[in-house]
């Protein structure tokens, strides 16, 4: 699907994001969806990555099913009612759409919704099962299809009174998270549009003309931005922000018509909490909610940009119809997915292993009967597409280890059951005296022994796999891998600041199974394991919404989100004084790791082997002590991070007010605190080193290597964090230097202005200055100072007023453009009305001429009947009857002509009234344009006057400066005399 958007960063078993793009915890990479794969029990799990593991066809949830197709009728619009539109299509029951004019034309669908159906009912039938499947790991796609102004955007987005499919789906997703305590979820969203065959990112205005890429896993958009979401309100705010960048325009059918296809993708990642029956598999799915642009009818008289947009929309929708026709035709060898970007992104949905729901919105009006029929035929073809839903599961090395451990427990339980089943068999053997029964019991006993041996061998083989998989990731933890990993939105360095991040994940796996020196597996105390699991929090557990405290849930989530934002961004400034502390911590961390390794090597060189075997109690005690030291070190690190953030704020305040001594004192105190924290961290490191050296005799060699490798990993992570902070400190130092230089420049400029002001104050009256030079130098003229200050204030006011006038001028220009467009539209309507009026006048003239001819014929007939002699009429009675019948027919035709003439005159009067109304509206628009032009000219004159006044004041200032020069020369001459 289109949301498999990746910027091709692949780091090992599953694709993992290592950088955060912005402080909003957004990402520009996305994951690949892998189907559940079976792993051979004879292969080592350490060598099985997602691509190297054998890929089998996904196990379907059920048999093949068809695309869910529903039809929704919208009510007649007021415009259609005014025009007298009739119902051409209607819902015949809950599943059939029938034509009003031809009852034999009917189509059957999964559900048909009438005009009075609410969007909530549509969601319950057409979308809810797709959303539930997506939360369970099955890909889902819901899209609305129909002609323009048929109600697609209303169905998908809705309004405050009637929410659409997208808000309802988001709300249901978070409700499912709240109702699923055994799994933890991570949700990411992306939102983009296809406008004129160009993919634009709606969440990132800079992401324009993005490219569609393909690899072995499918189609994705390169560089698309994803946002990690924490609540329904967060998702809806992102949708609202994206809608502001969507292309919308007015057409003859709709004032606000969508001019692009939009696709909202919700990526759902979930993992189990604690033990589960699936071996710790991670579900990764995508829910795509698509709002297609409406197809443009040939009746729409568009031009320019609207015509171009309509051609691109029709092309993509025509390609979509062709693709659906090919998919329903089993003889088709080629499906043209690549003919448009819409079908290219929908390829995995229409031909993959996910659920698809199509909502067709139609209008029952007779004027759109043909377009409605085409939409119904499209929906009927889509109904025959077969799909097969399947869960997307990802199993990494840790999940495989948990799966093997679960299998070992099951096999041991089976072994215990077999042992319990053998005892009654031996008792029956002693009791029975029949030889046949003895033979049968012996055979059964041999079979049980063989099964027991097979189970023991399988347990040993799985134990070896666990040992290998536990050791191998430690050695390759810092090495680069080329295989793709499952994508996470939070890296290890980002999760370090989350409130429940623990480092006992590997300890829990190591405690799960203890293997003695003889190779016999021993399970550690279950009570201790349960205690460890209750203290452990999942990487995604912080995202869950608690039922009891729903009112505080949003605030807590937002606080956690802000914590992630402030700590995960690589470019977060930390202040100027912590750079040397960062470098010292780096050196101390690397030195501590090297010292531990050297100590181990020296001790291993002198000792050949350990004489004591480690017990589970000793291991538990050592792990607890190490965990306490690590928690102390983690607490100090968090306190130091908080102090670094405080240092950042103080640095910003110092940049704004460099003369504030209190801020400088606080910065110095913070530097001292940070240095003290560094010393405490170094002390803890030494304590950990002493603890490792003291407990070296009690630990096994493999455990020491593992502990040191874990400590080295932690130190390397801390070093990486400190490197990031050092870079941030350098950046903030440069910013602070720039601010300081800028403040110095401002101070110099203020000094120059003060000097000019003092010179202007000394000017005043030349005669008084020459007579009282010493007195004027000691006490400056306050009145002149007030005048200059008033002039400066007036200049500032004039500048502000000029800026306001310029903004008002721009607004008036925009308004003039809109009025000009409306005027052109009114002119077009007036011209069309004039053409129609001309045609009507010609028709009226023709009817009048015809009426005159008929009147002349009638007069001639009447005259001939009057002048006819009585004798002749008496002899031709039959002819008289015929003439009377003809006369009646002529009178009837005359009455019909009179009625037609009356109707035509009434139509002429109505058209004349409409024309007069159009002319009046055009005159009003022209008057409005003239008034706006006059106001624009007036504002331009005012602006010119303002600029002239500013120039005049500047010239006065220059004259005052020249006068000050002359006064200074006079002063020199006066002192010389």
Swiss-Prot record:
Cystine bridges: none
Single GO BP term: microtubule-based movement
Protein name: Kinesin-like protein KIN-7L, chloroplastic
Gene designation: KIN7L
Signal peptide: none
Stretches with biased composition (Polar residues): 1-12, 563-575, 864-876, 958-967
Pfam families: Kinesin
Top-level taxon of origin: Eukaryota
GO function term, MF aspect, one: microtubule motor activity
Family: Belongs to the TRAFAC class myosin-kinesin ATPase superfamily. Kinesin family. KIN-7 subfamily.
Residues forming coiled coils: 386-471, 626-688, 732-942
Residue spans of biased composition, Low complexity class: 22-31, 38-54, 551-561
Ranges of residues in domain Kinesin motor: 66-385
Keywords, in A-Z order: ATP-binding, Chloroplast, Coiled coil, Microtubule, Motor protein, Nucleotide-binding, Plastid, Transit peptide
Comp. bias regions, Basic and acidic residues: 879-891, 968-977
Region (Disordered): 1-66, 549-589, 864-891, 958-977
Binding site for ATP: 146-153
A GO CC term attached to the entry: chloroplast
Main location: plastid
Subcellular location: Plastid, Chloroplast
InterPro entries (UniProt xref): Kinesin-like_fam (IPR027640), Kinesin_motor_CS (IPR019821), Kinesin_motor_dom (IPR001752), Kinesin_motor_dom_sf (IPR036961), P-loop_NTPase (IPR027417)
Family matches, as CDD domains: KISc_CENP_E (cd01374)
Organism name: Arabidopsis thaliana (Mouse-ear cress)
């Amino acid at each position: 699907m289109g949301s498999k958007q990746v910027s091709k960063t692949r780091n090992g078993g599953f694709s993992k994001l290592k950088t955060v793009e912005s402080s909003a915890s957004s990402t520009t990479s996305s994951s690949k969806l892998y189907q559940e794969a079976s792993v051979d029990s004879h292969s080592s799990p350490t060598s099985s990555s997602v691509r190297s593991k054998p890929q089998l066809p996904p196990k379907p949830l059920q048999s093949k099913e068809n695309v869910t197709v529903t039809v929704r009728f919208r009510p007649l619009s007021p415009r259609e009612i005014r025009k007298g539109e009739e119902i051409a299509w209607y819902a015949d029951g809950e599943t059939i759409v029938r034509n009003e004019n031809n009852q034999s034309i009917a189509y059957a669908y999964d559900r048909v919704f009438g005009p009075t159906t609410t969007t909530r009912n549509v969601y319950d039938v057409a979308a809810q099962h797709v959303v539930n499947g997506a939360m369970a790991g099955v890909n889902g796609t819901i899209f609305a299809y129909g002609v323009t102004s048929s109600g697609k955007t209303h169905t998908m987005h809705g309004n405050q009174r009637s929410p659409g499919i997208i808000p309802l789906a988001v709300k249901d997703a978070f409700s499912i998270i709240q109702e699923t305590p055994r799994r933890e979820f991570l949700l990411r969203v992306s939102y983009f549009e296809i406008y004129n065959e160009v993919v634009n990112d709606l969440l990132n205005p800079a992401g324009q003309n993005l490219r569609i890429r393909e690899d072995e896993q499918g189609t994705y958009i390169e560089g698309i931005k994803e946002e990690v979401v924490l609540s329904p309100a967060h998702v809806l705010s992102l949708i609202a922000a994206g809608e502001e960048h969507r292309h919308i325009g007015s057409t003859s059918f709709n004032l606000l018509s969508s001019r692009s296809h939009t696709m909202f993708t919700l990526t759902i990642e979930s993992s189990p909490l604690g033990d589960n029956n699936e071996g710790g598999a991670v579900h990764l799915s995508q829910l795509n909610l698509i709002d297609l642009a409406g197809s443009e009818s040939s009746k729409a008289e568009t031009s320019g940009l609207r015509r171009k947009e309509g051609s691109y929309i029709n092309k993509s929708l025509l390609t979509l119809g062709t693709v659906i026709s090919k998919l329903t035709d089993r003889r088709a060898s080629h499906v043209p997915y690549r003919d448009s970007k819409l079908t290219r992104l929908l390829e995995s949905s229409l031909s993959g292993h996910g659920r698809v729901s199509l909502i067709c919105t139609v209008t029952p009006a007779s004027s759109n009967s043909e377009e409605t029929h085409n939409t119904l035929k499209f929906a009927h073809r889509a109904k025959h597409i077969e799909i097969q839903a399947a869960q997307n599961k990802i199993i990494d090395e840790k999940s495989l280890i948990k799966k093997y451990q679960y299998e070992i427990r099951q096999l041991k339980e089976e072994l215990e059951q077999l042992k319990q089943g053998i005892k009654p068999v031996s008792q029956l053997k002693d009791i029975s005296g029949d030889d046949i029964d003895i033979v049968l019991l012996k055979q059964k006993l041999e079979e049980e022994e063989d099964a027991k041996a097979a189970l023991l061998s399988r347990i040993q083989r799985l134990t070896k796999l666990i040992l290998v998989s536990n050791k191998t990731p430690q050695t390759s933890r810092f090495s680069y891998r080329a295989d793709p990993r499952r994508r996470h939105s939070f890296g290890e360095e980002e999760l370090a600041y989350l409130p429940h991040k623990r480092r006992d994940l590997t300890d829990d796996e190591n405690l799960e199974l203890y293997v003695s020196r003889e190779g016999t597996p021993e399970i550690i105390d279950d009570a201790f394991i349960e205690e460890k699991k209750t203290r452990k929090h999942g990487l995604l557990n912080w995202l869950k919404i608690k039922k009891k405290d729903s009112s505080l849930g949003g605030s807590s989530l937002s606080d956690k989100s802000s914590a992630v934002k402030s700590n995960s961004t690589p470019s977060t400034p930390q202040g100027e004084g912590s750079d040397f502390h960062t470098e010292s911590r780096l050196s101390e961390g690397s030195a501590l790791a090297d010292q531990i390794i050297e100590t181990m090597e020296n001790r291993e060189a002198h000792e050949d082997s350990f004489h004591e075997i480690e017990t589970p109690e000793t291991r538990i005690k050592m792990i607890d002590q190490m965990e306490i030291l690590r928690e102390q070190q983690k607490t100090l690190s968090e306190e130091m991070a908080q102090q670094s953030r405080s240092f950042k704020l103080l640095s910003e305040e110092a940049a704004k007010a460099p003369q504030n001594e209190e801020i400088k004192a606080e910065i110095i105190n913070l530097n001292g605190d940070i240095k003290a924290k560094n010393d405490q961290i170094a002390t803890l490191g030494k304590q950990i080193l002493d603890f490792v050296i003291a407990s070296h005799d009690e630990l096994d060699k493999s455990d020491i290597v593992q502990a040191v490798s874990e400590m080295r990993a932690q130190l390397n992570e801390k070093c990486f964090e400190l490197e990031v902070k050092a870079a941030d400190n350098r950046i903030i130092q440069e910013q602070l230097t720039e601010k300081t230089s800028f403040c110095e420049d401002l101070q110099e400029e203020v000094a120059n202005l003060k000097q000019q002001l003092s010179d202007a104050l000394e000017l005043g009256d030349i005669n008084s200055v020459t007579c009282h030079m010493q007195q004027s130098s000691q006490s400056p003229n306050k009145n002149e100072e007030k005048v200059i200050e008033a002039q400066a204030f007036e200049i500032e006011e004039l500048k502000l007023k000029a800026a306001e006038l310029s903004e008002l001028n721009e607004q008036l220009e925009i308004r003039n453009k809109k009025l000009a467009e409306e005027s052109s539209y009114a002119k077009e309507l007036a011209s069309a009305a004039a053409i129609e009026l001309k045609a009507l006048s010609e028709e009226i003239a023709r009817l009048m001429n015809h009426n005159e001819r008929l009147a002349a014929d009638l007069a001639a007939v009447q005259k001939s009947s009057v002048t006819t002699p009585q004798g002749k009429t008496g002899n031709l009675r039959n002819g008289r009857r015929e003439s009377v019948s003809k006369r009646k027919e002529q009178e009837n035709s005359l009455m019909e002509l009179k009625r037609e003439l009356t109707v035509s005159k009434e139509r002429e009067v109505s058209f004349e009234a409409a024309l007069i109304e159009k002319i009046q509206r055009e005159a009003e628009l022209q008057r409005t344009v003239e008034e706006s032009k006059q106001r624009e000219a007036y504002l331009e004159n005012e602006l010119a006057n303002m600029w002239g006044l500013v120039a005049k004041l500047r010239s006065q200032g220059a004259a005052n400066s020249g006068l000050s020069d002359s006064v200074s020369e006079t002063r020199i001459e006066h002192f010389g005399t």
